[in-house]
A protein has these predicted regions:
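Gram-negative outer-membrane beta-barrel transporters
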Residues: 3, 385-393, 401-402, 501-502, ...
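Transmembrane beta-strands of outer-membrane beta-barrel pores
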Residues: 158, 174-178, 192-194, 203-207, ...
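C-terminal beta-signal and adjacent terminal beta-strands/loops
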Residues: 510-512, 599-608, 632-689
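Signature of Gram-negative outer-membrane beta-barrel scaffolds
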Residues: 213, 341-446, 458, 469-471
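Periplasmic-side early beta-strands and strand-to-turn transitions of outer-membrane beta-barrels
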Residues: 116, 142, 155-157, 163-165, ...
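Flexible loop and strand-edge segments within Gram-negative outer membrane beta-barrel domains
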Residues: 206, 212-213, 219, 237-284, ...
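Acidic, small-polar-rich N-terminal luminal/periplasmic segments of exported/outer-membrane proteins
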Residues: 34-165, 180, 491, 672
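Outer-membrane beta-barrel signature, preferentially recognizing the C-terminal barrel domain
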Residues: 170, 257-282, 320-325, 372-374, ...
Length: 689
């Protein structure tokens, strides 16, 4: 498959200009002991901060250099992988689990994508570098952050700025790289002891990349986001904040029949927090949010309609879908010596609608049609016994009432529209979740834990409304697909010493009524069916970092996931293969240098024709290994320049979790996985004031 693209540009003036600007501002910076500093030079892998919890700074440079969305950031945490669409907007997978099994929150709000095939998954609307912290909880080991998080929870968080005197804080970065990669991020906060104004913005763009064979892979993108927050802090324990944000993007997808011509985001939120309340009552928190995703897919903005494709794709066409989600949460914390209690309520309401048109931009004149409405309310509590001691029991319980209404009056098919047999029907379900975990500190720096968790998940929009068919005997997926129930055991060991840090975690679970997609045929004529099966999952992750003499560090991580379909006695689809990362880093007072080897084995445990709403197993995949180098220079504790080369030897390879390339771009009719980028150069400057 051959394509042409415009030559790569240098784009080198941007980091130089930013570097000169921020260097000039150093003359007016705060004293060194008050400065906000940059710590790690380049992140190649993340380690847990506590049992099953990962916390990392998304603004630090990462290798391989991530795309503009959140999926590539998550891949530095062992156990995460992603399904590639093109150059950006990959769909995250944790331990082989996909979709709403992974609860993704931005500033404690839920922004759900609108595309029936998840071309705009939730991470498509999140700009990671505009957040202060990325927190990950693996497994069903928390009930605080919503229902159904059987695989885990991902939170992109912003801190509350506090000022002792009037001042200004800033975070800025610029990135340039191969295929005209060009990113800028600016986050400014102006405040005093009684309040603040915070404004953040980012833009990101890149052209189509070339794989290791030199072939162009359709993958270009352009993105921007902007957010502003105004906070009132009358004292050190009180916060009232209102915020608003917007964004948009375009993205070319090698593995889709259409591209993303619009990713419009509109967000509003408010939050209140009061700490150090009298007596045992310590904290009260509340937040409300409104998020809307307005997404346009077409086959003419970023490509030319393919005259050889099946109807109706030879002619220009577009689909406009919209998802509005609004919700809120109230929680309180109580402390009694070594006992901590958290209790609260939360809920959300979501509406999905769409319109489409044949011909360029004719969809704009079409009327909106609502097809689904979701609603959920829940109560939760978490209890910690032995908080602050060397033996801790942590438990949680959650109960949710979920409902969904089918608003479709008719269902589109290859032979035209037909009446919907479930029009106006509503499904209601009670969902229960809970966990119990024991943690013990055995010696200095050594901790082990074991936890048992259970999660019940309501089928999401993509599982109820996207499939062409439901289980055998059901009129459609809306009536036939049942809630998914996961029971999982997590165990692990962590050690943090002066020179050695090591950790290992393992899990085994049983999933009743796992929601499985089966595909019959391919292309526009292909049909999908959603059904429930019983499944088993298991796996492990491990990491090691050793500090040697001479400021050297050696590290490595390992991740493995396994799944089995008990009903059909075959592998569970979309399971990533065994992956290892080995790193060597040298870090001096100002300079650092590092190397990263990533090795992935073949995957022969496949279930061809089965998967999820986005992807299916395309057959066995080959193993591969890539090598990357990085270097960084710290001008001061606040200013840093880093650079690197990914896929140094220009290897041609593809990931197991993948889409088949679209025939519109010259990919063969037989499914062929999309190759990863070839050799890529990048340079990034970070400034923090």
């Amino acid at each position: 498959m051959k394509m042409t693209s415009r030559p790569a540009g240098a784009c080198a003036r941007l980091p130089v200009a930013l570097g000169l600007a921020v260097a000039a501002s150093l003359a007016h910076a705060a004293p060194a002991d008050e400065a906000r500093t940059l710590d790690t030079m380049v992140v190649t892998a993340a380690a847990p901060s506590s049992p099953l919890h990962w916390v990392t700074d998304p603004r630090l440079p990462r290798q391989p250099v991530p795309a503009s969305d959140g999926a590539d950031y998550l891949k530095t945490v062992p156990g995460f992988s992603a399904i590639r669409n093109g150059g950006t907007n990959g769909d995250p997978v944790l331990r082989g689990m996909f979709g709403s099994r992974l609860n993704i929150l931005s500033n404690d709000g839920n922004l759900i994508g609108a595309c029936p095939s998840r071309m705009d998954n939730p991470l498509s609307y999140i700009a990671p570098e505009s957040f202060d912290r990325l927190t990950i909880i693996k497994g069903p080991q928390s009930v605080r952050w919503g229902a159904g998080a059987s695989a885990g929870t991902v939170r992109f968080e912003r801190d509350t700025p506090r000022f002792d005197e009037p001042g200004l804080r800033a975070d800025a970065s610029a990135l340039v790289g191969s295929r005209n990669r060009n990113d800028q991020v600016l986050d400014l906060t102006l405040g005093n002891p009684t309040g603040y104004v915070r404004a953040s913005g980012n833009r990101s763009e890149a052209d189509d990349y070339k794989d290791g064979h030199g072939d162009v892979v359709p993958s270009k993108w352009r993105k921007w986001n902007g957010d502003v927050a105004i906070g009132w802090t009358p004292d050190a324990d009180t916060l009232l904040e209102i915020s608003a944000g917007a964004g948009d993007a375009i993205a070319r997808y090698a593995g889709r029949g259409m591209d993303g011509a619009a990713f419009e985001r509109t967000s509003y939120a408010a939050r209140f927090e009061k700490r150090n309340l009298p007596g045992a009552w310590d904290t009260l928190q509340a937040n409300v949010y409104y998020n809307e995703a307005d997404h346009v897919m077409d086959n003419y903005t970023l490509r030319t309609p393919n005259p050889n494709s099946m109807m109706p794709m030879p002619m220009p066409m577009a689909s406009n879908v919209d998802r509005r989600t609004q919700g809120g949460r109230v929680s309180s914390e109580w402390h009694w010596q070594d006992v901590q209690l958290v209790a609260g309520v939360d809920g959300e309401d979501s509406r999905h609608r769409g319109r489409m048109g044949m011909g360029r931009d004719t969809y704009r004149q079409a009327a909106w049609e609502t097809d689904a409405k979701f609603r959920r309310y829940g109560v939760f509590t978490e209890l910690t016994l032995g908080a602050g001691t060397d033996q801790r029991w942590i438990s949680g319980l959650r109960i949710d009432r979920a409902s969904v209404r089918d608003e479709r009056q008719s269902i589109r098919g290859m032979m035209g529209n037909r009446p919907n047999p479930t029009a106006g029907q509503r499904r209601k379900e009670w969902l229960g979740s809970g966990f119990l975990r024991y943690e013990q500190d055995l010696a200095d720096g050594l901790t082990w834990y074991a936890g048992l968790g259970h999660s019940e998940r309501m089928p999401d929009y993509w599982e109820l409304f996207s499939p062409n068919h439901g289980p055998a005997g059901a009129v459609n997926a809306f009536t036939g697909v049942q809630p998914e129930r996961t029971t999982q055991l997590d165990v692990g060991l962590q050690y943090k010493g002066p020179r050695v840090q090591a950790w290992v975690s393992a899990y085994a679970g049983q999933i009743q009524d796992y929601i499985l997609f089966t595909y019959h045929g391919s292309g526009m004529m292909g049909m999908s069916q959603a059904r429930n099966v019983d499944a088993r999952i298991a796996g492990a992750e491990a990491g090691l970092e050793v500090s040697l003499a001479g400021q050297w560090k050696l590290g490595g991580t390992l991740a493995y996931a396994w799944g089995g379909n008990r009903d059909q006695q075959r592998p569970l689809p979309q399971m990533p293969p065994l992956e290892a990362r080995l790193s060597a880093n040298w870090e001096g007072q100002r300079w650092s240098a590092g190397a990263l080897l990533r090795a992935v084995t073949h995957q022969h445990r496949v279930a061809e024709g089965q998967g999820n709403v986005v992807a299916q197993d395309l057959g066995p995949s080959a193993g591969f290994a890539t090598f990357a180098l990085n270097a960084a220079y710290r001008f001061s504790s606040q200013l840093q320049l880093s650079a690197g080369v990914d896929n140094l030897f220009d290897r041609a390879y593809s990931e197991h979790l993948n889409l088949a390339g679209s025939a519109d771009f010259g990919f063969p009719a037989d499914p062929e996985r999309i190759n990863e980028p070839g050799r890529s150069l990048w340079m990034k400057v970070n400034y923090r004031y």
